[in-house]
């Protein structure tokens, strides 16, 4: 009986440690859609690895163009072949997984010419992918959770207008989540203005293909310094560490799983805005098993 206070104190310490760890627990976001060999959306969410799935990409829109979605080898949107994705979207959402549509990407034809052009794109997105109505919804009748900005080319203006117009649709019922994947050099050349609106829920920063602010040869200082600048300057609900899921997924910036879990994550998880890790992409994650190796540490 004399040892009971010590045991109680130990249990209390363990409970406090568990609470602290749970407060900083994050989720994994994954990009899906650019390789037909990465499995369906339903299969992706059935793995239990991911909290967010970003469908990539709507890579033609704006400046008067007819918008087009490109899901690589998954389906052919020109023949309405991608409406079957609705089943996958709903299956994911039924598991509590948020599903977004990503705008842009590294290859495509997209830009915004004016505030009115941004409004037209927002209206199109609302009617064709969100809570609006259209006879030509490319992914069928499922209602996505939000829109992801992965703007890497084209115009540098009016993305803030697009964010504001999309945010306004949250007033019509279901919240429209806004997410973004800026490059780690601060500020982002294309999305800086949009991110300054403070309207974004999740920001998954690309810490790869950018040597000045990525992990390199055992040096994590540039990455951590960049992370701290982003999280202390931009207003967003949560920030995510964006990484390639394998060394083949990007030209540079891959972090071995053991280095990520032992060195990088402990250095950034103290941030109150820490949300988890974003990976490019589902196909490369399948090949490497990266998410399985890091999941318990994220």
For each of these PLM feature ranges, what is it?
Residues 2-7, 21-263, 268-272, 284-297:
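Chitinase-like catalytic core of GlcNAc-active glycosidases
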Residues 274-281:
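Long amphipathic alpha-helical assembly cores
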Residues 11-18:
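Bacterial N-terminal signal peptides
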């Amino acid at each position: 009986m004399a040892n009971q206070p010590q045991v109680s104190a130990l249990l209390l310490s363990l409970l406090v440690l568990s609470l602290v760890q749970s407060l900083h627990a994050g989720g994994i976001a994954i990009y899906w859609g650019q390789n037909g060999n990465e499995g369906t959306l339903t299969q992706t969410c059935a793995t239990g690895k991911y909290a967010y799935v970003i469908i990539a990409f709507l890579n033609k829109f704006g400046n008067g163009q007819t918008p087009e979605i490109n899901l690589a080898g998954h389906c052919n949107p020109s023949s309405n072949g991608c409406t079957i994705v609705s089943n996958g979207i709903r299956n994911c959402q039924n598991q509590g997984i948020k599903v977004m549509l990503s705008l842009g990407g590294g290859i495509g034809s997209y830009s915004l010419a004016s505030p009115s052009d941004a409004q037209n794109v927002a209206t199109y997105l609302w009617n064709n992918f969100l809570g609006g109505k259209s006879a030509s919804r490319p992914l069928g009748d499922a209602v996505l959770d939000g829109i992801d900005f992965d703007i890497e080319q084209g115009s540098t203006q009016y993305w803030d207008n697009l964010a504001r117009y999309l945010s306004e649709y949250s007033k019509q019922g279901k919240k429209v989540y806004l997410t973004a994947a800026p490059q780690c050099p601060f500020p982002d050349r294309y999305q800086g203005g949009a991110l300054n609106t403070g309207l974004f829920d999740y920001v998954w920063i690309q810490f790869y293909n950018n040597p000045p602010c990525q992990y390199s040869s055992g040096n994590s200082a540039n990455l951590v310094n960049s992370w701290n600048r982003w999280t202390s300057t931009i207003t967003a609900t949560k920030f995510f560490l964006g990484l390639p899921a394998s060394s083949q997924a990007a030209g540079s910036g891959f972090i071995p799983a053991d280095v990520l879990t032992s060195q990088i994550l402990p250095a950034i998880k103290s941030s109150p805005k820490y949300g988890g890790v974003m990976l490019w992409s589902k196909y490369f994650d399948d090949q490497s098993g990266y998410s399985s190796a890091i999941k318990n540490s994220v």
